[in-house]
């Protein structure tokens, strides 16, 4: 009976938004959470640690490995678009400068293949370009380098893939690096 009367006394206390009652406490006094000091939040730390590895790339300050002048394709990029054409399929990859594949799209994927009449046609290239552009934007990649060979640049399918990427919102040229 004594416990029931205490619970009725705690009910109005628990309804206050700033008060909390400890669950295993036997006292009826509410626990008040102390206010945070707003002056401490304005202080700037003397040492800054960058925990986002892509931050320098987005600011156009990160280094681009230049490689040798005689190397083709050039190694001066943060992200590069590679297109691999096999006998039956088309695959487009976005490669980071360290060699890792960040995003890819291919006509081997069932989600893309089921909408296509042919996995090698010009329309397939444009579809792969649009899907890859959407995936790049979802991953936060807005700029990349595309360096086609002269015979690739002249083909209709590669032109349509570029058009699909550009219409999707990806810029196929990276900003210049800021050296200062």
UniProtKB/Swiss-Prot annotation:
Pfam family of the protein (one): Ribosomal_L18p
Q: Which domain of life is it from?
A: Eukaryota
InterPro entries named in the record: Ribosomal_uL18_bac/euk, Ribosomal_uS11_sf
Q: Biological process GO terms, please?
A: rRNA import into mitochondrion; translation
Q: Does the keyword RNA-binding apply?
A: yes
- Which subcellular locations apply to this protein? Mitochondrion
Q: Which UniProt keywords apply?
A: Chaperone, Mitochondrion, Ribonucleoprotein, Ribosomal protein, RNA-binding, Transit peptide, Transport
Q: Which GO terms describe its molecular function?
A: 5S rRNA binding; structural constituent of ribosome
Instruction: Tell me which positions the record assigns to the signal sequence.
Output: none
Spell out the subunit comment.
Component of the mitochondrial ribosome large subunit (39S) which comprises a 16S rRNA and about 50 distinct proteins.
Q: What does this protein do?
A: Together with thiosulfate sulfurtransferase (TST), acts as a mitochondrial import factor for the cytosolic 5S rRNA. The precursor form shows RNA chaperone activity; is able to fold the 5S rRNA into an import-competent conformation that is recognized by rhodanese (TST). Both the cytoplasmic and mitochondrial forms are able to bind to the helix IV-loop D in the gamma domain of the 5S rRNA.
Q: Name the chain's protein.
A: Large ribosomal subunit protein uL18m
Gene source species: Bos taurus (Bovine)
Q: What is the lineage of its organism?
A: Eukaryota, Metazoa, Chordata, Craniata, Vertebrata
């Amino acid at each position: 009976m004594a416990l029931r009367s205490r619970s009725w006394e705690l009910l109005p206390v628990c309804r206050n938004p700033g008060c909390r009652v400890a669950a295993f406490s036997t006292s009826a006094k509410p626990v008040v959470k102390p206010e945070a000091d707003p002056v401490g939040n304005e202080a700037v730390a003397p040492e800054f640690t960058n925990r986002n590895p892509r931050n320098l790339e987005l600011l156009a300050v990160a280094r681009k490995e230049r490689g040798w002048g005689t190397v083709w394709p050039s190694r001066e990029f943060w992200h590069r678009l590679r297109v691999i054409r096999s006998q039956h399929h088309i695959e487009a990859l976005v490669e980071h400068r360290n060699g890792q594949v960040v995003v890819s799209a291919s006509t081997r994927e069932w989600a893309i293949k089921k909408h296509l009449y042919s996995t090698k046609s010009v329309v397939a290239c444009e579809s792969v370009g649009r899907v890859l552009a959407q995936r790049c934007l979802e991953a936060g990649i807005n700029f990349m380098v595309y360096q086609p060979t002269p015979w690739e640049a002249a083909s209709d399918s590669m032109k349509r893939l570029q058009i699909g990427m550009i219409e999707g919102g990806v810029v196929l040229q990276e900003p210049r690096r800021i050296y200062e």
